Amino acid sequence: MDSPHIPVLLKPVLNSFKDIKNGTILDCTLGYGGHSEAILISNPNLKIIACDRDSESLSFCKAKFEKYSDRIKIYKSNFAGILNKIDHEDIRGILADIGVSSLQLDLDERGFSINSNNLDMRMDKNQTFSAKELINSYSKDQLADIFYKYAELPNAKSLAQKIVDARDKSPIKSAKELSSIIGRSNLKNRSVSIAILAFQAIRIEVNKELDELNNLLNLIKSSKINNAILDIISFHSLEDKIAKSTFKEWEKSCICDNFVMKCECGNNHSIGKILTKKPITPSEDEIKQNPRSSCAKMRIFHIQRNV
């Protein structure tokens, strides 16, 4: 069954797991199964535990992976919650692709696109809070805060005021209407339109994407997972910063304060090693085949605890 979504950085993902002879790979963001399918094909001794919040993609994948039913288990869960449901002992690889699928972007009813007639942006359709509720209920200051924090828009306050003024006349009901209020011009030195950046900020807030990533990383650190490769694929600078800074902290053996002259912590706190000093990015060929992959970055960490 062909996937309606092209998995990003597929070759680097497979390469990162190539030395894993057997065991289980945890796919924290199954989507339409592109990465998981390639992993299963690459090594018949590997199994997959996968999860996603999107009911539509889960239905697709349950049919897609029927022939691999003895090698893959699929759960409806966010990627932080899945760690509470599984045995950590056999996990040898973890993949988290922190992005929206092409199908989610393209389906009008999902309301992710600036041209959509809907205004939704929920990755989990069972979630009650959507972009429509956010846009029509957040205060001016709350809107400005997410535009500045998640999209780094210098005109965040004036943008928030535009939205408040418009909804005071009539509730904002569609993404198309919202994007016309925001405007589609580009900021100076930015190739992406203001509307796309603002929509990205709204999506991050609706789905609590940064919280989800932080929760996942915290749970991995406190878990019993060991001798495993962790791949984090991000599409936003804030997500990449979280992965980068977390991996740096995990690699530290000494966690004493900087002013301490002599180590007092035992110098044994490292839980592994960073395998990518710089993030892996898509090749020119991949970007040509899938332009949406252009801003993807992947960082890899080898979890190796002192036990």
From Swiss-Prot:
Q: Which domain of life is it from?
A: Bacteria
Q: Which UniProt keywords apply?
A: Cytoplasm, Methyltransferase, rRNA processing, S-adenosyl-L-methionine, Transferase
**Binding residues annotated for S-adenosyl-L-methionine, in chain numbering:** 33-35, 52, 83, 97, 104
Cellular component GO terms held in the UniProt record: cytoplasm
Q: Does the keyword Transport apply?
A: no
According to the record, the segments passing through the membrane are: none
Instruction: Show the catalytic activity.
Output: cytidine(1402) in 16S rRNA + S-adenosyl-L-methionine = N(4)-methylcytidine(1402) in 16S rRNA + S-adenosyl-L-homocysteine + H(+)
Q: Which Gene3D superfamilies match?
A: Putative methyltransferase TM0872, insert domain, Vaccinia Virus protein VP39
Q: What does this protein do?
A: Specifically methylates the N4 position of cytidine in position 1402 (C1402) of 16S rRNA.
Instruction: Give the matching HAMAP family.
Output: 16SrRNA_methyltr_H
Q: What is this protein called?
A: Ribosomal RNA small subunit methyltransferase H
Species name? Campylobacter fetus subsp. fetus (strain 82-40)
Phylogenetic placement of the source organism: Bacteria, Pseudomonadati, Campylobacterota, Epsilonproteobacteria, Campylobacterales
